[in-house]
Amino acid sequence: MEFSVMLNLLIEGTVMTAEIFFVTLVLSLPLGMLVCFGRMSKNIIVRSFFKFYISVMRGTPLMLQLMVFYFGPFYLFGLQITDTWKQLAWILGFSLNYAAYFAEIYRGGIESMPQVQYEAAKILGYSKSQTFMRIILPQVIKRVMPSITNEAITLVKDTSLAFTLSIMELFNQAKALAARETNMIPYAIAALIYYVFCLLVAFVMEQAEKKMSYYR
């Protein structure tokens, strides 16, 4: 196989990897905040539910979760697995998994805020929602940015788990090409692409963190 053809196939895989990454990030970041609110709820039923959800998502392998979402409808209800469901399965699997991790990151940031800030905001006449949105949340985001960056970099590498659903992302393309060509060149190129992707994510997140430094 010509090198240009191999490279084009790996680029196609990279596009799929990027799609998984960005869709997961866009969905799991806000969902994680909602899960965080549920985890910190004063209602014991709500709090227990989200605590259990987080425990399951963090305590079982992401690969297993993807397979449950993908094959679950077939084994439980006898439903036919379609390409549309395959797309929905990885979206649900990745988003729900990472939402649990982001929820705990947010919770740690919120609980680290001094109680005196809430009291000062109350004295100034701020409502609870105003206090959170205008005073607490900006500081929390700044504090948790390093942890979010670490999770984002982990997500870049975790996208390779989509191969379990036969999705032709970067790793799966490299695996197929390496088997066809019986050499390690596709793996080496894929490793380089993953590394550059991680560097770009780290750079973007670092710039975002610097822009928020005025919250200190």
For the regions a language model picked out, list residue spans one by one.
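Transmembrane alpha-helices and adjacent helix-loop boundaries
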Residues: 1-216
